[in-house]
UniProtKB/Swiss-Prot annotation:
Name under which the protein is recorded: Catalase-peroxidase 1
Cofactor: heme b
A GO cellular component annotation in the UniProt record: cytosol
InterPro entries: Catalase_peroxidase, Haem_peroxidase, Haem_peroxidase_sf, Peroxidases_AS, Peroxidases_heam-ligand_BS
Entry's EC annotation: 1.11.1.21
Residues the entry annotates as binding heme b: 259
Annotated organism of origin: Burkholderia vietnamiensis (strain G4 / LMG 22486)
Cofactor comment: Binds 1 heme b (iron(II)-protoporphyrin IX) group per dimer.
Amino acid sequence: MSTESKCPFNHTAAGGTSNHDWWPNRLNLEVLHRHSALSDPMDAEFDYAQAFKQLDLAAVKRDLHALMTMSQDWWPADFGHYGGLFVRMAWHGAGTYRIADGRGGAGGGQQRFAPLNSWPDNGNLDKARRLLWPIKQKYGRNISWADLFILTGNVALESMGFKTFGYGGGRADTWEPDDVYWGSEKIWLELSGGPNSRYSGDRDLENPLAAVQMGLIYVNPEGPDGKPDPVAAARDIRDTFARMAMNDEETVALIAGGHTFGKTHGAGPASHVGAEPEAAGIEQQGLGWKSTYGSGKAGDAITSGLEVTWTSTPTQWSNDFFKHLFSYEWELTKSPAGAHQWVAKDAEAVIPDAFDPSKKHRPTMLTTDLSLRFDPAYEKISRRFYENPDEFADAFARAWFKLTHRDMGPRSRYLGPEVPAEELLWQDPIPAVDHPLIDDADAAALKAKILATGLTVAQLVSTAWASASTFRGSDKRGGANGARIRLAPQKDWAVNQPAALAAVLETLEGVQKAFNDAQTGGKKVSLADLIVLAGAAGVEQAAKQAGVAVTVPFAAGRMDASQEQTDVDAMAVLEPVADGFRNYLKAAYKTPAEALLVDKAQLLTLTAPEMTVLIGGLRVLGANAGGAQHGVFTDRPGTLSNDFFVNLLDMGTEWKPASAANDVFEGRDRASGQLKWTGTRVDLIFGSHSQLRALAEVYGSADANEKFVRDFVAAWNKVMNLDRFDLA
């Protein structure tokens, strides 16, 4: 018998076989319950925006400036200045952002949590965060970690002589890891071609991923799969940076600007490096990568395994990166750790050593640095920047600002005295309110006018949903404000039924014009407001037909953006590949439709109950794309009833697949075999999945219709106002 004591508690956080272990393909709803108030230690009334407004930002910056040259024995500063380390910290925090789903980025301070805190590409950034703790501790709740990371990157640049474009605060911290798909690989830095590879075909990177290997921010600095080919690496760079919304010019500016500072670390073999923070011993207190090579720090530090310093002034802004890139020929070599890198051929030793002032080194570069010279498009931009250093500085300042603010949403969310006055197209600008807004009486009169046009409940509801449901909680883009549903590209998306949409918008524009023309005091209603108001009118009418009197909340204040204020390419990524709320799939996908529904719900910041009640309501209101009848489990469409749930849960119906792909099903009378309904996976999951069925049973009960209506209205109102940051 074993003498090892067994823990008497078998239900602790230490483990046990989970549901996911037993049923790995089971639909995971946990993503809908992340970041709840239960995980937030701040008081319920805490308002981070108000707390930040009380911050003495200048004092924080003074402390950060002092920190830059306050080298600590436990992690000494390269060249006596932490600037390069902090630039990397901010870059890697923001650089996880990807345009496909808006996830990643600097918001929330996710670099504090797994997996990002333990990614190989984030090696030794744990030390950067610990260096910041005294400052975070000093200012407490008035500045979030997320804001502090980016501010520190800015101050690092400024302390090294660079003029930044600006800074906006407002990133509230999160308190647990995001649930983000970073890839299927089971091994850090796994090469392409493996069983879980993110690549297919001719090096086609899986969407929505924006990094070439698991655990990297963008590209492998040694080249694709570690092969030192600068031209091939350029393809990876262009692909990954484009997936983060950066064009070629911004890409060159970011790489060259960032690599003007600091160095990489590869003093010895990686075998000396210990476990990452999440796997390190408890006594290391959240630090990782403890190295046994020499002192394990300073000149003995090992991070990427590369040992490169790009410029002769690594703590000062300069044009040295391009000077060295074009002044030398480069030959392939290896770092002390054995990593592929390049050294200037027949060059003098002009690069200072990070810790020994008596030493000098020849200029060195990464494979991905040389891409800026040997890729024709990058080379043209690089030479222009080399010959026009002021243009380069401006391009880097703007690209850095975009990098570090891309996931913050509209400019109205930026806080602090350093927010730049210039409005930028990538911020999806919307005009400021410049006229008196409609009041409750106006709203009621307008709803009556809308209903009198003859537009159906389905038309009103589907148009409002199409407008508002573009919102992504990940990067705060999209939503009803701006009425971009009437502009390219949204007006032409297949899911929006362009011809039918145009007819609805034309009718609503007529109502808008009649109202605005009748006003004498300058009062106006925007089309953005009117679209949402029309949806409210449709919902109220449908609820009335179900015997429930309800008023959908409405707050005026949206404005209409112009086509000139809309970046068509940047807006195109908001087009849904799937919208289960409208029973829409753009194409056939490997990912099951029900999983895509949950993904959409998470982007809309919905809980599982909110997702459930919205599905049930939108089905009976006839909001399906193209008027499809799948999931319309009612004989009274246009009435806001709980029929979807009642009929889905009816044991008198037997369901069978009606397609080889198991994506459409027929529900027949169990006794007669007569066809009653058709449905998709998105419909049937609410009867199949045990947790969703439990929710469906609440709304399918005999006493549930009024609760169903009121819960639907609450969830509907939430979606309509997701982008109303002015109401928060």
